[in-house]
């Protein structure tokens, strides 16, 4: 039996997104802008065969600007929350499922999208930028950890950023090499904040 591809299900995803105000499906991911400061995604993270590892991802325009300055990267994930399988017993049981027909695909996609909306309502339901950055779920690992650290700089929480960069805040995996660049740049950002009230 021929397996479906993400191209096959793109029309389904677009139709699902159209049912919910503010949502769109572009570049193989669901997205919605939060006011004019952030974007929330329900990212399927499609596999080659039609399965997904869906997750909720948050980005922020100011963090992206900071990331551009430091790393020349403009799409910095600052928070991540996996969408778990219905029968998940561990936080690592992401909602993965192979599907073979368009109807199976629609049922699966609609289900993980709906579960993603519940996560957003529970954890990211803030229109105010400061509230969102201060209350979003924290993920300290890898690239997302870097993004979280940058979000603390944007919020002028230099102490947390310093502790993360100095490895006083421990992580399971070794910290991303970009952390060294954050560490060396922190005094510059602090000085700029003291002079102008902003790090950007």
Could you tell me what each predicted segment is?
Residues 2, 31-200:
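Intrinsically disordered, low-complexity regulatory regions enriched in serine/threonine/proline
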């Amino acid at each position: 039996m021929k397996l479906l591809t993400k191209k096959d299900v793109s029309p389904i995803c677009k139709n699902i997104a159209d049912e919910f105000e503010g949502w769109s499906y572009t570049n193989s991911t669901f997205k919605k802008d939060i006011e004019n400061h952030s974007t929330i995604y329900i990212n399927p993270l499609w596999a080659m065969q039609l399965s997904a590892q869906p997750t909720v991802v948050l980005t922020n325009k100011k963090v992206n600007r900071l990331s551009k300055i430091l790393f020349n990267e403009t799409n910095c994930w600052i928070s991540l929350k996996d969408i778990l399988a219905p029968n998940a017993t561990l936080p690592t049981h992401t909602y993965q499922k192979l599907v073979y027909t368009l109807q199976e695909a629609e049922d699966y996609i609609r289900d993980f999208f709906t579960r993603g909306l519940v996560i957003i309502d529970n954890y990211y339901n803030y229109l105010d930028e400061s509230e969102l950055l201060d209350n979003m779920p924290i993920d300290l690992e890898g690239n997302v950890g870097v993004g979280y650290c940058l979000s603390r700089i944007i919020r002028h929480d230099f102490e947390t950023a310093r502790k993360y960069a100095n490895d006083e805040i421990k992580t399971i995996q070794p910290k991303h090499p970009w952390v060294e660049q954050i560490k060396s740049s922190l005094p510059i950002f602090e000085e700029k904040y003291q002079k102008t009230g902003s790090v950007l």
